[in-house]
């Protein structure tokens, strides 16, 4: 009987630690973290920014696109599809601050009741910050985000 108690004594904490590790490694959906509406139809507009440093002049080039359901329904749907499909992996230490001189994307959506979601900041290498927590974005999601930016760039420039 004593051996069973010892086994349970060690098995329960080990199971809890395993559960915590699995929860830590489980990818999180971007739309859930951003507290977006349940449906993309409830999103009124999306603000999409790309900030790129010009190292020679120490300036930044900011391209800001505000996509609305009235003007650009297809583009808005494309970004909403990305927001609902993208996954963030592995919360990382770092205080939720991005220190990188590279290109940064910022996205946030506004629902039809005019409440804005939390912004997500994404670097080109796939690091992302939401609510002060640093995550890693999957490579396929990063490639899709770059494709959306290229699509926006060809339409508006």
Segments from the language model and where they lie:
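Function-determining sites in protein domains
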Residues: 2-157
């Amino acid at each position: 009987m004593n051996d069973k108690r010892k086994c349970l004594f060690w098995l329960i904490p080990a199971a809890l630690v395993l559960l915590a590790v699995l929860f830590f490694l489980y990818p999180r959906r971007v739309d859930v973290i951003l507290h977006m509406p349940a449906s993309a139809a409830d999103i009124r507009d999306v603000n999409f920014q790309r900030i790129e440093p010009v190292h020679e002049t120490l300036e930044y080039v900011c391209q800001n696109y505000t996509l609305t359901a009235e003007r650009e329904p297809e583009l808005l749907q494309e970004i909403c599809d990305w927001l609902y499909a993208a996954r963030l992996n592995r919360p990382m230490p770092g205080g939720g601050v991005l220190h990188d001189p590279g290109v940064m994307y910022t996205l946030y959506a506004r629902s039809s009741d005019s409440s804005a979601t939390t912004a997500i900041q994404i670097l080109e290498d796939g690091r992302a910050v939401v609510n002060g927590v640093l995550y890693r974005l999957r490579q396929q999601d990063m490639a899709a985000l770059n494709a959306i930016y290229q699509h926006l760039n060809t339409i508006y420039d």
